[in-house]
Amino acid sequence: MSPAAAAEPDGDQQDRHVSKLIFCFFVFGAVLLCVGVLLSIFGFQACQYKPLPDCPMVLKVAGPACAVVGLGAVILARSRAQLQLRAGLQRGQQMDPDRAFICGESRQFAQCLIFGFLFLTSGMLISVLGIWVPGCGSNWAQEPLNETDTGDSEPRMCGFLSLQIMGPLIVLVGLCFFVVAHVKKRNTLNAGQDASEREEGQIQIMEPVQVTVGDSVIIFPPPPPPYFPESSASAVAESPGTNSLLPNENPPSYYSIFNYGRTPTSEGAASERDCESIYTISGTNSSSEASHTPHLPSELPPRYEEKENAAATFLPLSSEPSPP
């Protein structure tokens, strides 16, 4: 097995571990946030009245502390999820790797469901606490010990009206999380259907087309691939040092191919290629004959007059009849 093929399962397994860690941080932060909100509301709204003297002070400290820790965990998980998504896009992942995170659903869908359930439960508890706990009643008022304490004998439980307002608002936030979960699930289903339809279309395009005309069947070959396929374009884009040779929408010009389409060669090969191109243009038959200069003799050719005299002396001698 090649190292690249062995590295891919390790990378997928590491991504799964990171996804599980992010999910745990989300759930832990959401639970702490809701518990902190409930403790804060109960500590600051109910424990500040004299009819409930047994409310400990620790609730007023533990509530905001839990809420802050939970909010920090949620923010940390969110930032880590963004980093994982960017790393996946840089590696060329087009689809979400967490589509089947838990029970065949995506991680974001599960997170939105958990958030919605927690907020919905918290809002209902706050609403029940604000509605069913009696407020502003005479049973909660202390009896005055003397005439000077008559001003302190007024009922003090009217502060639960804020719980009656905050409860439905938190329930509404929980319902909004359910709506977001439904939208994310629908988007995931649409993306999966589009991907499957695209694959089916590519398979159908690569198959030959049969057309029946009367009793004869005409088979048309599949169309040729595109001039610049997406796979080659992405491979060129990912490979370093090829930024100047990226494919464009139109085919490259002749001059760009002639100038930039050469491969680096040695000096001897380059000189031989130049000689071949030059002698091809000049019309010579072979490069060997044109490259070697002819050997010139050291003696000078005879003069033109000497040639005429030699020809004149040769003709009379040849015209005389031979003796018997």
UniProtKB/Swiss-Prot annotation:
Residues 229-239 have a biased composition (Low complexity). Its main location: membrane. The keyword Cytoplasm does not apply. InterPro entries: TMEM171. The keyword Transmembrane applies. Coiled coil: none annotated. It is a multi-pass membrane protein. It is found in: Membrane. Residues 229-248, 279-304 are annotated as: Disordered. The chain crosses the membrane at residues 22-42, 57-77, 113-133, 160-180. It holds the Pfam family TMEM171. Keywords: Membrane, Transmembrane, Transmembrane helix. Residues 279-291 have a biased composition (Polar residues). One of its GO terms (cellular component) is membrane. This is Transmembrane protein 171. The gene is TMEM171.
